[in-house]
Amino acid sequence: MSNIAFYVVSDVHGYIFPTDFTSRNQYQPMGLLLANHVIEQDRRQYDQSFKIDNGDFLQGSPFCNYLIAHSGSSQLLVDFYNRMAFDFGTLGNHEFNYGLPYLKDTLRRLNYPVLCANIYENDSTLTDNGVKYFQVGDQTVGVIGLTTQFIPHWEQPEHIQSLTFHSAFEILQQYLPEMKRHADIIVVCYHGGFEKDLESGTPTEVLTGENEGYAMLEAFSKDIDIFITGHQHRQIAERFKQTAVIQPGTRGTTVGKVVLSTDEYENVSVESCELLPVIDDSTFTIDEDDQHLRKQLEDWLDYEITTLPYDMTINHAFEARVAPHPFTNFMNYAFLEKSGADVACTALFDSASGFKQVVTMRDVINNYPFPNTFKVLAVSGAKLKEAIERSAEYFDVKNDEVSVSADFLEPKPQHFNYDIWWRKLYHSCWKTKGTTCEQYDDTRSRS
């Protein structure tokens, strides 16, 4: 009997160092350097193993913002990935946020194949690799890379104007027969998540096609040995029938691990499926060059941008969503001043800390880690009312206590989908889902 180990990280978002950079010289058990150390320590027990990145590696952290601001190149990020010797990866939706030339340059620099079978540029796959086969002893491992098809709903049109996005389900259905003919082991590497509960099959979200994981498992699990997922930042390690299912969280806080065993008759089975915690280790060190790079990054983050008239610190994010707060008022006011729009709304991310009086680059990036631009839209009153009522569904009230609705907590927290509104709007009762709005004039209004 022989074993093959598969180690997976996903949604690292450029968090290389063991810190989220909320403060200088902070240390946390996270990041690609420490996650890779965990992998290298564990893989010693196996003769054969794979190291996999499941996408969203190029954007979403202070380090990624630093690279685009200072050099316009991902070379320093690529250097980390190349020296860690990944075997293959796939594309995430955030890979497109800096534009197609930046992504293509990154792909040229990486020393491992990035697989994506369902995104096309003209008549060929964007990465020139959709499926790849690896020979491991007498076994052939076939891997297909897939990415959520929902990218056009988020991305700036000029970043993806030459691309076509296909359903991951449909492309997998197309490729599987050929993969079965050529491979003994089939691995699906999907930067997308699950639209239904894995046990009950009950939908956990509106079925838009953004996440097709459950549909693929339900239809094809008998042909898939390992089903790798991401995008939702969930931590999943379980079996769907005989298929190992992995989703290893985000920012390098956990590592997905699957071990397949092959018996003397070449029958393949799942030996184990688990998440390895990324924890501090006395043998883990950061070399001098990496420490120097981190210092440069910390200095850039501490650059003072401006001084405000008063403190806008957020001590409790939920309270800032329930009642007017100087930070969200400031942001919405700035949007209106810049755009000339009639109405503005913004969201608070989980990392939001507001602004101290002296605002640094660190403060800006901690509040909005993804450098997205605001959007100006023309909408009807009916659509605006519908959007406000959707925001109202964020809240639940029991015994006169306001809390967050379970719909925004399961299967993953979605606080970023609650919009905080500004200007003459409507005031919506938050007691029950489906409550309608009544006219309400208040420049500090909440939905």
Predicted regions and their residues:
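Generic alpha-helical secondary structure signal
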Residues: 33, 75, 101, 170, ...
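Short, solvent-exposed loop/turn motifs
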Residues: 140, 316-319, 432-433
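Acidic, metal/ion-coordinating pockets
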Residues: 1-282, 322-334, 344
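Context-gated lysine
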Residues: 51, 104, 132, 180, ...
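Generic preference for well-ordered secondary structure
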Residues: 87, 91, 156, 229, ...
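Amphipathic, soluble alpha/beta structural segments
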Residues: 126-134, 190-196, 267-285, 302, ...
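A short C-terminal boundary segment appended to hydrolase-like catalytic domains
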Residues: 262-360, 367
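Feature captures C-terminal
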Residues: 3-5, 15, 28-30, 34, ...
